[in-house]
């Protein structure tokens, strides 16, 4: 088995170079297919092997049934080709690419198709496709399903499970703030997804943020866009400038674009290597943003917090060392920070905190454990999964599906319970 730069195992024979055809799909050519067996839809693993793997995972019967249905559908689809897709609309853009809602005409399935324009050499492009094949083995109720990837006319296409509720950054725009009971369920699921990637595949996400957490009308919460392809990350870092992101890839500061700064952790700016602790920082910052309804660096001042939360706010005063720039004409609201001003703030100023008196002490404690400046002091995945806030969330019956459908104005795919707003 060969390995890529993230130490991920690749299928046997995947290092073989393919011809420079414009519609390379990243799956086996007919000649190679005959020698390796019918594994085109699943990389190096058969359907039977994948079904056996999901039997070993911790999930309920409903989740297991949905996983089995997804894998069977995926086998029927087979190889993907650009001509088989019909664009239905655009879902979002960022990180150098656009995500469309598309119908796979032969099967009738609706998919999310991410298109990334890359001007790279054929060998680099083929390496990206090979590295993305690892996603065939990433099957979990907490990870967005992967149908396949291919290349055509300067674009890498990554075809994924369609989540009709969209990403949490879009939900946040509609909801203004996300209620704590919903956030607790989100956090619990994200932790399970990160633990699955780490324990089963030795993968670190590298880009935890609201736009990479997706929801649907069935109440499912799944993470996407994790750093499985080192070559793709490097190629995008070298190519794109100026789109907002929360990614913390292992690239030098001089190569970071504007998009890569917002959720970067302090130790990365000091030259340390990326680790699971980096994902924990990004998760903590995401929780604060979704809870208060605004990016928390620089932190909002007391007047802004009182406008947001009213009389719930207890005594809040700015940190004596805090430098929180304000916009002229918009009292209390942080002005956008220049990139190096933001980086300096992340490294040298206190980390964000949830405002006192608004949220439960357990939620505040979990966020504080995520946002320790020193990664050695930051809580790890196991500690967070055993945290009181998470354990309580797993016991509570919160209607995620109802909240998603109400927030995004979509039709429930299953009957919903009383709105989660009642718990907020």
Predicted feature descriptions by range:
Residues 110, 115-138:
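Conserved N-lobe beta3->alphaC-helix segment of eukaryotic protein kinase catalytic domains
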Residues 1-78:
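Intrinsically disordered, low-complexity regulatory segments that flank or precede the catalytic domain
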